[in-house]
Each structure stands twice: as C-alpha cells, then as structure tokens.
Regions:
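NAD-dependent ADP-ribosyltransferases
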Residues: 1-261
Length: 261
C-alpha cells in the first residue's frame, strides 16, 4: 500500500445534510463522472497531431487489406476522431487536497456546505491517486495522444462483416487511465480520486458502491451553523458504537481548515 503524508488535508464536500448522514453511517459513495481526453480544442492543432500518426495508420490498414485511400470519407473521419480523443463515465470519489491557510470558499460555494476532512491513511487504504494535469497541446498532452493513437491503431482489426473496428481491450485500458489525467491550464487545484471499476469490458460496474468510513478516518466535519448540534450528536453516537476515543470535531464551515483545535 502506498504512503500518503499524514500532514496532507483532504476535503470532500456534499450539498445536502442527508448525503453527509449517509456517508457517516454507510460510507462514501462512488458516483459516475464523465472523464475526457482531447489534446487540444483547436482544429488546426489537432490536424497536426493526426498527421503524425497517419503513416502508422496507413501501414496498419494496408496490412489488414483495407488501404486508407480505399475508405470512404465517413469511415476516415470516424477513424481519425477516435484515435486519441476519448470520453466515458467512470465511478469515482473526488477529494481536494487543501494546503494550509487555503480558502475554502470556492469549495463550499461550488460543491456544497457539508464537508468531511478525511485522513491521509484512509485515502491510501482505498487506492486514492492525485490527478495529473496536462496543458492543452502541451508536450505531455501531445505524447499522451500519440500513445493512445498508437495503441488504437495497433488494435485495429477487421470484423467478420468486413468493418474496421477498434479493439475493446485496448480501448478499456486507455479508459481506465483517463480518470487520473485532466487536460486543462487551471492548475490551482490538487484533486485526488478513488476510482472504481467501470465494467466497460465485462465485470461488475462499481457505481454507487460505498467505501467504509469510520469516525477514526475523519479529522473534521464542516456544516452550516444550524446543523452543528445535530451532527455533533450523530458523531458522538457513532464514535461510541465504534469505540472511537477521539471523534472528529464538528464545526461551522470555516474559511480554512484549522491548524489545530
């Protein structure tokens, strides 16, 4: 199991009191989020990237007995658009790594006024990973496109009906990578995700799976002022049931995570 420094603070927000109650009683839930990879939004830049892999595509199609210049324009466009740009829905749990003294206002207004500060050990136990951010048409996003396009090209095959198809196993491997990568230029956030099985190629999909969460796993609980007493009572009951000697502190949603209580 990986080690995540215990000094790091991880925030998970939700918009409703009932959702927080469910998390405290039944664990945190994996929900579907769309993940997407496109190296650039600019058509001309995308064309340059496609041109770099066309020789490999042409060689692969020729080897399959389907030369590129014999395909109709509709099929060519489908092949080119599917080479290195992908999207899909993946079950996951999202958390934000919060540096000391960082304002929580954006998180509260964007994601909800009920929140948990979860200990690093819990994230490590459940396989959480920090998201890698790459810039639009940056060297990293270009290389990711090249890798994905190459895998897609090498996985091309001809169906019994003569159609050219992408390989599901190759596609699944790439889709499983996408939850850990985001293409964007805004780099102020540090997001972590616990990613569940999507079941694209067989197997059970883990949407709505709950990850056990004990009082010992939580450092703070943030709620609106009028909910502090209610959740303090809930936490004390759960802590007693679980034998937790130091239950998490319930606070009115602060402007930043307290350094200590």
């Amino acid at each position: 199991m990986r080690t995540i420094p215990a000094s790091l603070k991880f925030l998970h927000c939700t918009s409703q009191a009932d959702f927080l109650t469910m998390a405290l009683n039944s664990g945190l839930m994996l929900t579907d989020h769309e993940v997407r990879f496109a190296p650039t939004q600019d058509g001309a830049e995308f064309g340059v990237l496609v041109d770099r892999v066309v020789p490999l595509l042409a060689a692969r199609l020729a080897g399959l007995g389907k030369p590129l210049d014999t395909l109709d324009e509709t099929r060519k466009r489908a092949l080119f658009s599917g080479l290195g740009s992908m999207c899909g829905k993946i079950p996951m749990l999202c958390l934000s790594e919060i540096p000391p003294d960082k304002s929580l206002d954006h998180h509260r207004f964007s994601f909800g006024s009920f929140a948990l500060v979860i200990r690093a050990e819990w994230l490590a136990c459940h396989g959480a990973e920090r998201i890698v951010y790459v810039g639009l048409n940056s060297p990293a996003s270009q290389q990711l496109y090249n890798c994905m396009a190459t895998m897609h090209i090498l996985g091309l095959h001809v169906s019994p009906t003569g159609d050219i198809l992408f390989d599901n196993v190759t596609t699944n491997a790439m889709l499983e990578l996408l939850p850990y990568v985001e293409v964007r230029d805004h780099l102020e956030e540090a997001e972590w995700r616990v990613v569940g099985r999507a079941g694209f190629v067989g197997g059970a999909r883990e949407t709505s799976k709950r990850l056990p969460l004990k009082m010992d796993d939580i450092e703070y609980i943030f709620v609106p002022n009028d909910a502090v007493a209610k959740f303090t009572s809930q936490v004390l009951v759960l802590a007693n049931q679980q034998g937790c000697s130091t239950p998490p502190t319930v606070l009115q949603f602060p402007s930043c995570i307290p350094a200590a209580i």
